[in-house]
Amino acid sequence: RFDGIFRSPTEPGDPPVTHVQNARARYRFRLNLDTDLYPTLSFHGQLATGPVNNALTSDQDFGGITAKHPFFISEAWIDYHPTKEVQLQGGRVQAIFADNSRFLFDDDVRFNGFNEKYVKSFKKNDGYFSSVEFRAGQYIFSNPNVAIITPGSPLARAGEVVGTTGRSANLFHQGVLVNQSFNEKWSDQFGGDVQLYRHPNQIQLASTADGVVLLVQPGLGITLSGPLAGTGNATTTPGGAIYTAPAFQIGRLTYKLNYSGFQKGGHNFPVTLNLQVARNFGTGLNERDAMLAALQIGKITKRGDTSFLYVFSIKGANALISQVTDDDLGTGTGVNIRTNHFRFEYGIAKKVTLQSLFFIQNSLRSSGQYPNFFVPVSAFVPTSYRLQQQIVFSF
């Protein structure tokens, strides 16, 4: 199965002070490979385009003169499902709570590790509960392979204790989702989850020149053109490798209301309302909260279908880790933003969709506004307007 996107984005728009424009074309191409090894065991793999040092996108710019663009392993996992209720995955997997909402994680981020899910379904009851899902994920970010951290080690610059062994960075993500079905038209989902990061400063370290050499390039076997993209969090020094937040222990609550919708002119218009809030309980500092509210009307299933989406999101500089959260709501930063996002879709054909996306982005705080608080994009930067048009197809 193939799918892809052709994009024509303009960013960061036309700020009223600098009048900087960046208009360019992009494409993405993904090849999915799926097979059932046994009735209870299956394999999934995906090859995708995109810059190797940017995990937040599979888009490839029209550039490089005439050089060929690369194709990389984006996904590869084994799925074991001994019963209808249990699902176990291992490999390069999607985040266990991935929901394409542009909140917790970017749609293109994949993790090396393991997922577990248990779904308990219910018969019709007074509480309208249809099922409850218990989910957990354990992800491995790095393998420093450093027996003793010395004073000159990049790990020391990331806050690791000199004289100790270099440990891997990890994410442990677990939570529960409850599904309700009120009638044939109305349903909802609510729940919560917790993200516990271990040695999170290594993620920021990988976005520095010496960090990418230690933590990223040995695993790939190639030299990258630069550090990993996606910075945006507050750090203790300008461009430093230590987050201002001493820990990332993130709790999230989510609620989604679904309405099967209405018909007009032979087209269906389902309605979805999504609300999410998150707080980093690993710090008592300012800017540790994030939220998202989204309303979607319509869905593309055939030629002539239309859909409208509005998203409002705020992400504090100490709330989520910028290197793994969505990069479309923010230009040049994944957090420390307040963004209004509008999307209009039109079904050109059954599997071909024209999308028009518009982003209005403001930064929240500036460097030096709090002690040991330095961000790559400060609040004095003019409002950014970004228009992006793309054709999405799958076959």
What positions do the PLM features span?
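Transmembrane beta-barrel architecture of outer-membrane proteins
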Residues: 1, 24-28, 70-75, 111-113, ...
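Transmembrane beta-strands of outer-membrane beta-barrel pores
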Residues: 2-10, 39, 47-53, 94-96, ...
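Surface-exposed loop and membrane-interface regions of Gram-negative outer-membrane beta-barrel proteins
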Residues: 4-28, 35-84, 97-106, 238, ...
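Outer-membrane beta-barrel pore domains
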Residues: 12-19, 62-65, 206-395
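Predominantly transmembrane beta-strands of Gram-negative outer membrane beta-barrel pores used
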Residues: 30-33, 135
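Transmembrane beta-barrel domains of outer membrane proteins
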Residues: 32-34, 79-81, 117-121, 177-181, ...
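Short loop/turn motifs that connect adjacent beta-strands in outer-membrane beta-barrel proteins
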Residues: 37-43, 85, 121-135, 181-191, ...
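Surface-exposed coil loops of outer-membrane beta-barrel proteins
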Residues: 53-76, 80-178, 201-242, 318-333
